[in-house]
Amino acid sequence: KIDSLQPWSGRESWMKYSPDSLYILYCKNHNLYVMGNKDKGQDSTEVQLTFDAEKNFTFAKEMDDSDGEVETVAEWFKDSKKIYAVREDARKVKDLYLVNSLSQPRPTLKTYKYDMPGDKEISQSELLVIDVETKKITKFNIDRWQDQYFEVLYVSKDSERIYFERTNRAYNEKELCVINVLTGEVKVLIHEVDKPFMDFKMVSISFLNDGKDIVYRSERSGWGHYYLYDGEGNLKNEITSGDWVAGPICEIDTVGRALYFYALGKDENIDPYYYTLCRASLDKPNSVEQLTFDNVTHAVDWSKTFNYFIDTYQRVDLEPHVVLRNRHGKKIMDLEKA
């Protein structure tokens, strides 16, 4: 007998509810639509918001043709009054082909758009903000480089600021920017040049206190390290520094103002490819504290209070061990062994 299943809520995967749950946003025939949530007493008549979309210039999350309702790339602002969308124009991009050899009864061919090095025409991005009530569409000027890459990173709680990053095609120069949704003004907060090529796998930008603090990873010193900026783009502090690599962030304690991250190559007694857990104050330079010391690689999960963490450590010749440690790295007890 199965009695643990929850009743179906009626929410389809293509439904993108506003934060106040009064409206539903979706895509149909590549365009944006909105309707009221009848469960909240709203008019469920669908209203079309855009009219210029088409295949490969769509608001759908997937670019394939679809006559029915599908999930959209557009997102709600927190005020539930506006939406924003980053739409890609891939109409001039060349096709790439993939054969599904597992298809039955015969293999099938999938065709899709794909940017490749050397192409003269690649995908172009645009940023739109739409007022759901008035249906006014505002297109913002986000261009800096030809054929740039563009990504929205954070939206302020008051729905008035959009933080985004734009990167040139050569991937050796980028800018962190904020746009004022009310005025359209774009302000560059951080401008970064890293030749010949940026490490895109280690890119890390965290917004704290609704954008008043920004934790930004850079290789400007020749080593990957974290820096603290204020909301205006002014450097406040070098969180980490030295001839070693500050790797992925584990957690950020916004109350205790501490950054927990994995270091590589910091301890000469540990393989530089292994993750070593460290803590650093956001506000005090040269305050990095190493929390794990064994010659193994670590993966940790912190408690909500940051008083304890579960540490899973292993090595190519050592099976995974799971232990509980306090905030200083001292082992409290063994939990599991593979």
Language model: regions and residue ranges:
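Beta-strand C-termini and the immediately following turn/loop, strongest in propeller blades
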Residues: 1, 23-31, 36-37, 72-75, ...
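A conserved hydrophobic secondary-structure block that centers on an alpha-helix together
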Residues: 2-52, 56, 145, 151-152
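Beta-propeller fold detector
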Residues: 2-6, 42-54, 138-141, 186-191, ...
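Repetitive beta-architecture junctions, highlighting loop-to-beta-strand starts
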Residues: 30, 44, 125, 135, ...
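Short loop/turn segments that connect beta-strands within beta-propeller blades
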Residues: 37-40, 131-135, 181-184, 230-234, ...
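Predominantly five- to eight-bladed beta-propeller fold
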Residues: 41-75, 85-139, 328-338
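Short glycine-/Asp-/Thr-/Trp-enriched loop segments that recur within the blades
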Residues: 55-69, 145-150, 194-202, 242-249, ...
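Non-catalytic accessory segments flanking enzyme active sites
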Residues: 84-88, 93-96, 120-126, 140, ...
